[in-house]
Structures are given as structure tokens and as C-alpha cells.
């Protein structure tokens, strides 16, 4: 079974053509991916779990909700799992809208096997980063208000002495709060902490 550091990778297949789903299922399972197939978008949306490591392989033209509608609904829910469009439509407007909303690829049926697998490998990498960000964001939620205050200044490069002055507490207290917060976040040093928070764009959450 294909795995990454974040665990098993599942490709969610959404297409109203059963033959297409069968072909994709066979191909992707043969190379080691898990798959879950849907002939309509709504059941996928109803049971969607953003904590699952995976990507969505999505048709554009379907009865009811189309692929762009599904993408917009996921965006509305704040779910940024990678999306790859696989469609017969080569609409420039649809392509632009899909990429503007965060799609990582827009493939035209019948896509070459190598092209499809390359897009999914890119999705594996992207979603590993997403889940890492998700995990660290959950750790941020465990910080105390004081730890958040201290870290918000640490990641901006403010010295312990100046943080102590700004917060009206002793420098020793700054060191203790910084050490506790770094342990909670899993950061080995300040440089790693800064990289982590910048990548996650969580400085505003720490403020």
C-alpha cells in the first residue's frame, strides 16, 4: 500500500460515468493507491472528512452540482485538499476558474496514464504539507494566552529582553513560556519555529 509520512493516501473519484470510475479504480489501485468512487457529488460532500490524507479527482460536467460547484463548496467549508479535474470539456473559462479556486491540475479525457499519475504524485506532496499544517494548527490551539503572546513576538525576531519590556514580565518568564510553547508545537529550535509559523501563516492566530 502506498504511504507517505502522513499515512495512507486515498484518491476520491467523482464522475457520473461508471465506466470511467471503473477504469480509474483499476489503474490507481494497481499502482498502490486507495480509491473511493462516487457517481454523484452530494454523497461525497455528505461524508467528506478533511482529516483523511488524499486528493479529489473530479469531473467537470455532471447533473446537478458540477465540478466547479463541488470545488466552491469545499472552499466555502475551508477544506483545501488537492483537486485534480479530469473532464471532456476543454473550456478555457472553466480551466481558469478551477485554477483560481486552487485546483492543482486540469486534465482532458482521455488523459495519458503518466500525466494522471504525475498529477496525483503532486497531490500526495501537497496534501502531506496540508496535513502537517493542520496538525501544527491543532497544536497552536493548546497554547496558553501568554505562550501565544510570547511566540507572536519571537517569530517576528523580537529579543527576549524587548519581549519582557513589551509584556511587562520578567525575561526568565519569557524563556519559560517560549520553551513550553516550542515543546507543544514540536519545534526543536527558534529557526524551526519561525519556518513553521511562516509556512502556516499562523502568526495572526498567535497574536
Where does each model-flagged region fall?
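Receiver (REC) domain active-site loop signature in two-component systems and cognate sites
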Residues: 62
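C-terminal output helix
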Residues: 91-93, 111-120, 162, 166
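Acidic catalytic/metal-coordinating carboxylates
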Residues: 39-40, 66-69
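Basic, Lys/Arg-enriched C-terminal extension of HTH/homeodomain DNA-binding domains
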Residues: 179-207
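Short amphipathic alpha-helix used as the core "switch/output" element in two-component signaling
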Residues: 68-79
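Active-site beta3 strand of CheY-like receiver
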Residues: 51-57
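Active-site residues of response regulator receiver
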Residues: 59, 87
Amino acid at each position: 500500500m502506498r504511504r507517505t509520512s502522513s499515512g495512507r493516501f486515498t484518491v476520491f473519484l467523482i464522475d457520473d460515468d461508471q465506466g470511467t470510475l471503473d477504469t480509474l479504480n483499476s489503474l490507481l489501485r494497481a499502482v498502490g493507491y486507495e480509491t473511493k468512487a462516487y457517481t454523484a457529488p452530494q454523497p461525497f460532500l455528505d461524508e467528506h472528512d478533511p482529516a483523511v490524507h488524499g486528493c479529489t479527482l473530479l469531473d467537470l460536467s455532471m447533473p446537478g452540482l458540477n465540478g466547479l460547484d463541488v470545488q466552491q463548496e469545499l472552499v466555502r467549508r475551508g477544506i483545501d485538499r488537492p483537486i485534480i479535474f479530469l473532464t471532456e470539456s476543454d473550456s478555457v473559462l472553466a480551466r481558469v476558474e478551477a485554477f483560481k479556486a486552487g485546483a492543482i491540475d486540469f486534465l482532458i479525457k482521455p488523459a495519458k496514464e503518466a500525466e494522471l499519475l504525475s498529477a496525483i504524485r503532486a497531490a500526495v506532496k501537497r496534501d502531506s504539507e496540508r496535513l502537517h499544517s493542520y496538525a501544527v494548527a491543532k497544536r497552536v490551539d493548546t497554547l496558553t494566552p501568554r505562550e501565544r503572546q510570547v511566540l507572536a513576538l519571537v517569530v517576528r525576531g523580537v529579543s527576549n529582553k524587548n519581549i519582557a519590556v513589551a509584556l511587562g514580565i520578567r525575561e526568565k518568564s519569557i524563556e519559560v513560556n517560549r520553551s513550553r510553547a516550542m515543546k507543544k508545537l514540536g519545534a526543536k529550535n527558534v529557526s524551526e519555529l519561525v519556518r513553521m509559523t511562516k509556512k502556516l501563516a499562523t502568526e495572526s492566530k498567535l497574536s
